[in-house]
A protein has these predicted regions:
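Helix-biased "structured C-terminal domain" signature
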Residues: 1-388
Length: 388
């Protein structure tokens, strides 16, 4: 593993060439004290502000820098093919479009769209995927058939690290979607006993929330894939007016359950600072208005059911390895065992920068429920049906 300070030293010199004009520490804009940083890229073709979080400031600053670099790399994805799925699949391996996250717009296998070639990590063969779920140049018109966003876009010090991060993000988004579709009672039954959390880093983060008078609720949302995933909800105990009650969420996934929970805890703090700063281009004014009554009721009911503490931290599956390659192999085997047939990686690394960046596509997993065009897929619909 490479220390964040080493990563920063290696890649920060490329910041100006990637259009990153500012890298700042915004931790002090909130009282929690969990490090959060921002990288600003004004001419971005997607969002101009990227954020990072971590256990310490170097980790957060490096995280923000790398997220901004991912967006830059995904804006220029190289040459692809403009053809129909029928023609492409007759001569090449192509993903089953029925398994991709749809926007609801009917896909015609005879209509030409742009495709990019990737490599299937499970079948060890080339495989083509729709370009609109790879690139992030949203100044260009999208085909509009599939959910386009940053899900599955990741970077790292090594290709294996980038691939592992991308896969974990996709599994995390799938887990959150499946859990969210389950209904309030089923969700509450996945609550995590905070007292059972014995990892020192997690305890230190929980102490920061406690010192700041911030309530924390946790859920174990690990799915049949078997890679640890958590959701963290935070709310301000100093708020006395119900109409001002705000909840901020974070999620995390990693083979090592402690790292997964650290990611969820730090992301919740990052989300809260996102709303405090208002820096994200994709934040809408409606998100600052009063929360709907139904959301407040759900939050209160969940809080009451939190007392059941049905899941213990040590019971969550974990896999700790010192080698990133082992993490990656474990993730792929878990996906295969869960019935996933393809894990396609498109390498976006540029020789002139040397920063490993990938986009991973896993047909069959749920997408990001926060995406405005998200529609529940098979896994979410199944979870909803089982919870009725």
């Amino acid at each position: 593993m490479v220390a964040p300070s080493e990563t920063m030293a290696r890649f920060r010199s490329f910041a100006s060439r990637m259009g990153i004009t500012r890298l700042g520490n915004i931790t002090g804009l909130d009282r929690i004290g969990i490090p959060v940083a921002v990288a600003v890229r004004p001419n971005s073709r997607s969002v101009s502000a990227s954020q990072g979080k971590g256990l310490d400031l170097p980790q957060a600053m490096t995280s923000a820098l790398m997220e901004a670099s991912e967006g830059f790399h995904a804006e220029e994805v190289g040459e692809g093919r403009h053809t129909s799925h029928r023609v492409l699949a007759a001569n090449c391996n192509a993903v089953d479009t029925h398994l991709l996250c749809s926007t609801g717009q009917a896909f015609d296998i005879d209509v030409p769209i742009y495709w990019l070639e990737g490599f299937d990590l499970l079948r060890q063969e080339p495989c083509w995927v729709p370009a609109e779920i790879v690139h992030t140049d949203y100044t260009q018109p999208l085909d509009g058939y599939f959910l386009a966003g940053s899900n599955g876009l990741a970077s790292g010090n090594h290709l294996a690290e980038a691939l592992s991060s991308a896969i974990c993000e996709l599994i995390e988004r799938d887990a959150v979607a499946v859990w969210s579709a389950s209904g309030i009672r089923a969700r509450a039954q996945r609550s995590l006993d905070i007292a059972s959390v014995n990892d020192p880093d997690c305890r230190a983060l929980l102490a920061k929330y406690d010192d700041a008078d911030i309530a924390v609720r946790l859920w174990n949302v690990t799915t049949d894939i078997g890679i640890a995933a958590f959701v963290c909800d935070i709310s301000d105990l100093s708020v006395r007016e119900p109409r001002q009650l705000r909840h901020f969420h974070g999620a995390g996934c990693h083979p090592d359950r402690a790292i997964a929970l650290v990611r969820a805890l730090t992301e919740a703090a990052q989300t809260r600072l996102t709303y405090i700063t208002g820096m994200r281009d994709d934040l809408l004014p409606v998100e600052y208005e009063e929360p709907p009554t139904a959301d407040i009721v759900d939050a209160l009911l969940d809080a009451l059911r939190q007392e059941s503490k049905s899941h213990l931290f040590h019971a969550v599956p974990t896999f700790a390895a010192d080698d990133l390659g082992e993490d990656l192999r474990h993730e792929l085997e878990c996906l295969r065992s869960a019935g996933i047939s393809r894990v396609v990686a498109v390498d976006l690394t540029r020789p002139d920068f040397g920063i490993p960046v990938v986009r991973v596509v896993i047909p069959g997993l749920e997408g990001d429920i926060k995406h405005p065009n998200y529609l529940p897929g098979v896994r979410a619909r199944r979870a909803a049906a089982l919870s009725r």
